[in-house]
């Protein structure tokens, strides 16, 4: 596997930084911008103090907060899965059950934030990722 597209920092638990392919980046932005009116608000299931949180993918248990749905094409989901598997291999985690649960977009404005929180899952560490899609010109 080619590993030239990432870097790492040890902070107790490893943090890996990947370069997102332009087609994945453009696809996610395009879906968000064109499907925005259809996207389910994700606020009920997220801890962020953010007004605009919308789900692009959910594969968890259906509840009153969220039901299964998918707006992402296979190449985008496959890219995430490939990176999560690489993360596990990098950390020498050999036995795991990978369950890709959710993808959402936070559109954040001044004074909005994500508090410190824990993501739960069956893997002892859980996996989480963040992708910055757009920054204001004044940033």
Predicted regions and their residues:
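Catalytic core of non-heme Fe(II) oxygenases with the double-stranded beta-helix
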Residues: 104-139
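Hydrophobic residues on conserved beta-strands that form the core of alpha/beta folds
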Residues: 100-102
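Non-heme Fe(II)/2-oxoglutarate
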Residues: 1-95, 111-114
């Amino acid at each position: 596997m080619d590993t030239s597209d990432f870097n790492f920092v040890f902070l107790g638990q490893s943090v890996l930084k990947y370069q997102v392919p332009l087609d994945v980046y453009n696809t996610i932005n395009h879906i968000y911008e064109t499907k925005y009116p259809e996207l389910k608000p994700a606020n009920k299931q997220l801890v962020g103090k953010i007004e605009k949180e919308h789900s692009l993918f959910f594969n968890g248990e259906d509840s009153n907060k969220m039901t299964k749905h998918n707006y992402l094409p296979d190449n985008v989901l496959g890219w995430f899965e490939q990176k999560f598997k690489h993360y596990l291999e990098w950390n020498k985690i050999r036995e795991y059950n990978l369950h890709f649960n959710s993808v959402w977009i936070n559109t954040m404005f001044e004074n909005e934030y994500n508090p410190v929180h824990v993501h739960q899952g069956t893997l002892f560490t859980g996996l989480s990722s963040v992708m910055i899609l757009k920054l204001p010109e004044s940033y």
